[in-house]
């Protein structure tokens, strides 16, 4: 089932998401719906707050990106970045902030502790695009948006567009949730 994407200015995007204590069949169904919703919106990452849920769950699927066509969707639960290395700038966008793109500086590689879709604990290292997408989605779990990381002059360039989105002036090819609907129970 395709779920509506929560848009900039909705309060759930600004809250620190709650950790999951385990997963059951309802979470498995949610994960499937998140993957379907992300693909429908032509995204490569989606965090639970982006569908209105305050839980530390995210999905990454780089398969639409050239060079990553064989990548499988990755489920990340309760992530915690243990270490970072190197920094680089790269253009980012966000399904919750349609039509805005800007360069964001992030670590180029990370060591991540998380639980997978079977709730098994993992510690893995990620670099390049995967590291960037994971950090972007983890930011969502912490109530941070990529526009919060912009330098002042870059933020000024997108401010009017952000105000338009907050006012409901949003045009997407995917369904969006009503703004300020609040967080749903997890």
Curated annotation (Swiss-Prot):
<dbReference type="GO" id="GO:0046872">
    <property type="term" value="F:metal ion binding"/>
</dbReference>
<protein>
    <recommendedName>
        <fullName>Peptide deformylase</fullName>
        <ecNumber>3.5.1.88</ecNumber>
    </recommendedName>
</protein>
<comment type="similarity">
    <text>Belongs to the polypeptide deformylase family.</text>
</comment>
<dbReference type="Pfam" id="PF01327">
    <property type="entry name" value="Pep_deformylase"/>
</dbReference>
<dbReference type="InterPro" id="IPR023635">
    <property type="entry name" value="Peptide_deformylase"/>
</dbReference>
<keyword id="KW-0378">Hydrolase</keyword>
<feature type="binding site">
    <location>
        <position position="140"/>
    </location>
    <ligand>
        <name>Fe cation</name>
    </ligand>
</feature>
<keyword id="KW-0408">Iron</keyword>
<feature type="active site">
    <location>
        <position position="137"/>
    </location>
</feature>
<keyword id="KW-0479">Metal-binding</keyword>
<keyword id="KW-0648">Protein biosynthesis</keyword>
<dbReference type="GO" id="GO:0006412">
    <property type="term" value="P:translation"/>
</dbReference>
<dbReference type="GO" id="GO:0043686">
    <property type="term" value="P:co-translational protein modification"/>
</dbReference>
<dbReference type="GO" id="GO:0042586">
    <property type="term" value="F:peptide deformylase activity"/>
</dbReference>
<feature type="binding site">
    <location>
        <position position="136"/>
    </location>
    <ligand>
        <name>Fe cation</name>
    </ligand>
</feature>
<feature type="binding site">
    <location>
        <position position="94"/>
    </location>
    <ligand>
        <name>Fe cation</name>
    </ligand>
</feature>
<dbReference type="InterPro" id="IPR036821">
    <property type="entry name" value="Peptide_deformylase_sf"/>
</dbReference>
<comment type="function">
    <text>Removes the formyl group from the N-terminal Met of newly synthesized proteins. Requires at least a dipeptide for an efficient rate of reaction. N-terminal L-methionine is a prerequisite for activity but the enzyme has broad specificity at other positions.</text>
</comment>
């Amino acid at each position: 089932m395709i779920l509506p994407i929560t848009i900039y200015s909705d309060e759930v995007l600004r809250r620190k998401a709650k950790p999951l204590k385990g997963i059951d069949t309802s979470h498995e169904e949610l994960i499937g719906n998140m993957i379907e919703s992300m693909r429908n919106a032509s995204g490569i990452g989606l965090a639970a707050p982006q569908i209105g849920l305050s839980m530390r769950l995210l999905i990454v699927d780089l398969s639409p990106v050239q060079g990553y066509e064989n990548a499988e969707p990755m489920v990340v639960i309760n992530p915690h970045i243990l270490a970072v290395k190197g920094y680089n700038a790269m253009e980012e966008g966000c399904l919750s902030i349609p039509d805005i793109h800007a360069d964001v500086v992030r670590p180029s590689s990370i060591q991540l502790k998380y639980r997978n879709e079977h709730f098994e604990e993992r510690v893995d290292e990620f670099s390049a695009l995967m590291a960037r997408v994971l950090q972007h989605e983890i930011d969502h779990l912490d109530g941070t948006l990529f526009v919060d990381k912009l330098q002042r002059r870059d933020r000024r360039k997108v401010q009017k567009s952000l105000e338009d989105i907050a006012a409901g002036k949003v045009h997407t090819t995917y369904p969006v949730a009503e703004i300020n609907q609040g967080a749903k129970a997890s």
